[in-house]
Amino acid sequence: MFTGIFKKNINSKTNTVVSTLSLLRNHNLIDKNKRYKIIVNKRIPVFAGLGGGTGNAATIIKYFLKKKLSPKLLDIFENKIGSDLRLFFFNHSFQENLKKIKGFRKKYKFYFLLVYPNIKSSTKEVYSNVKRFNSPLKIDPSKINSKKEYNKFLINEANDLQKIVEKKHKKIKTILNLIRFQKNCLFSRMTGSGSVCYGAFQNRVSANLAMKVIKKKFPDYWCVLTKSI
């Protein structure tokens, strides 16, 4: 059962909650004869690139399996649900490739301004237009020891899918430029295959001021402030 402002965009018969329960039953991990009532307060947009559906799946898996999720089972769930599922089982980490997650040595606090421009971006369509991906990382982020070095690493990173989406939806670039030029914004980028645009800030005050600018310019867009954990 879905509640919340974005519940109308969810298909009640085909979603990650239904898929996850089905997988758990098929692998005899939960009782096939029992039915469960799961309520999801859908407060983030669909087709936003924020991993909301995958996060729901990970939460259900953690609840039923506790700490008994083997690497083999994780591979099975990941193949059916999404390649980003693995990330939800690690804290303060990055995905080096589809199968490898690494953790950072230190935690650094950032504030993120998220803007959803009411664009439903199809992951399948975006990936079908990829000609090539950037070269692998030249440095190992897990060995970063300072905030300055960490900031530099993030700023120099890029989303290979961003230009593809910008080409189709011009306002993505407009929003990202507006965010980037706000005071104390480290960088602005698009999430995954889109379409949420975000900016990273080092303090809440600057992020709040930027949010006011964005809300004034785009009053109909979903716009929220969050922070790293």
Descriptions of predicted regions:
Residues 48-75, 87:
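DPxDG-like acidic metal-binding loop motif
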Residues 36-40, 188, 223:
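Generic structural signal for residues in well-ordered beta-strands
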Residues 1-48, 65-72, 108, 116-119:
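ATP-binding N-lobe of GHMP and related small-molecule kinases
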Residues 28-37, 63-81, 203-214:
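Phosphate-handling active-site elements
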Residues 12-15, 88-187, 202-215, 219-220, ...:
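Conserved, helical-rich catalytic subdomain that frames metal- and/or nucleotide-binding sites
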Residues 198-200:
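Short hydrophobic/aromatic beta-strand micro-patches
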